[in-house]
């Protein structure tokens, strides 16, 4: 889900029903306000379906430095509080987009200056410290298409600049492939930084068109660039094997970006994907 309320995506009650029906047990909160924000009601709605929450999600523009801290913390703190109330231990941090995901309008330069990189690292460490101290949560930063933490080079630069004790990575296999990355190589190189997984695939033929035509991420999703496993890349078996060799317990949340999304479309895909992942050894 991309938005708290949008007629072109599945309603929250149907979402919860179908997640459970497809055989999954864990969900993320998604955009704040999509699921109920009252902790007791949220616990009731998830509990009666046998679901649990693994993480909340926040959106940040920390490369802008201290000037955006107060607004960022106001956004983060209420989501962190709800996340803690669910019993989850992780907060997924998505960097701000340099290009609007709907219109494709360029919002700022796609390349950060050296000063902006320093602020991004410094303020993300601050966020990790504050979220950990105040809410007992671990932040996992999510490299994402059309953000400044996207390509293998930018992901490596970000990881090299941040404290492993404060900042981990949410490796989204689809976004990383979309931006030219190899998930297995990243796991093998920065294994100690991988704190969370999003399992996803991209359609290589659609991706080639997207790159050639410089299509923004939102319209690329509408074209079907994110596809149902095992039809796309990366192959998930080697990714899961590499993650297994780390010897740590990781959440692996299954996703397929679909927007706009006909309401009848997700459930059959979710069922087939769950069966496929079981065949890969994922319980």
What spans do the regions from the language model cover?
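Short secondary-structure boundary/hinge segments and terminal tails
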Residues: 37-38, 63-65, 101-102, 149-150, ...
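Active-site acidic/histidine proton-transfer and metal-coordination neighborhood
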Residues: 68-169
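Histidine-acidic metal/acid-base catalytic patches
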Residues: 4-5, 9-23, 47, 87, ...
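Hydrophobic faces of well-ordered beta-strands that scaffold small-molecule active sites
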Residues: 27-29, 53-58, 91-93, 139-141, ...
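Active-site beta-loop-alpha junctions enriched in small/polar residues
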Residues: 1, 30-32, 58-63, 96-98, ...
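N-terminal pre-domain/capping segments
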Residues: 1-90, 114, 118, 125-126, ...
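Short amphipathic alpha-helical segments at helix-loop
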Residues: 26, 64, 108-112, 140, ...
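Hydrophobic transmembrane alpha-helix bundles
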Residues: 29, 33-34, 65-78, 91-101, ...
């Amino acid at each position: 889900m991309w938005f708290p309320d949008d007629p072109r995506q599945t309603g929250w009650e149907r979402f919860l029903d179908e997640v459970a029906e497809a055989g999954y047990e864990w969900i993320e909160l998604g955009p704040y306000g999509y699921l109920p924000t009252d902790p007791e009601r949220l616990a009731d709605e998830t509990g009666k379906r046998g679901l649990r929450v693994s993480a909340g999600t926040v959106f940040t523009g920390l490369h802008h430095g201290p000037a955006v801290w107060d607004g960022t913390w106001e956004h983060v703190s209420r989501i962190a509080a709800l996340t803690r109330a669910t019993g989850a231990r992780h907060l997924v941090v998505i960097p701000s987009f340099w290009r609007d995901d709907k219109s494709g309008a360029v919002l700022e330069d796609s390349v950060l200056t050296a000063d902006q990189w320093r602020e991004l690292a410094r303020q993300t460490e601050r966020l990790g410290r504050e979220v950990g101290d105040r809410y007992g949560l671990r932040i996992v930063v999510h490299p994402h298409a059309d953000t400044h933490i996207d390509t293998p080079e930018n992901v490596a630069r970000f990881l090299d600049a941040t404290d492993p004790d404060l900042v981990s990575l949410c490796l989204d296999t689809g976004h990383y492939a979309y931006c030219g990355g190899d998930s297995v190589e990243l796991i093998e190189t920065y294994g100690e930084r991988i704190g969370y997984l999003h399992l996803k695939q991209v359609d290589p033929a659609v991706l080639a068109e997207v790159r050639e035509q410089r299509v923004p991420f939102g319209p690329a999703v509408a074209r079907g660039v994110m596809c149902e496993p095992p039809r796309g890349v990366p192959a998930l078996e080697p990714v899961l094997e590499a993650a297994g060799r780390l010897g740590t317990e990781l959440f692996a949340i299954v996703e397929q970006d679909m927007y706009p999304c006909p309401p009848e479309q997700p459930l059959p895909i979710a069922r087939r994907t769950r069966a496929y992942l079981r065949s890969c050894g994922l319980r």
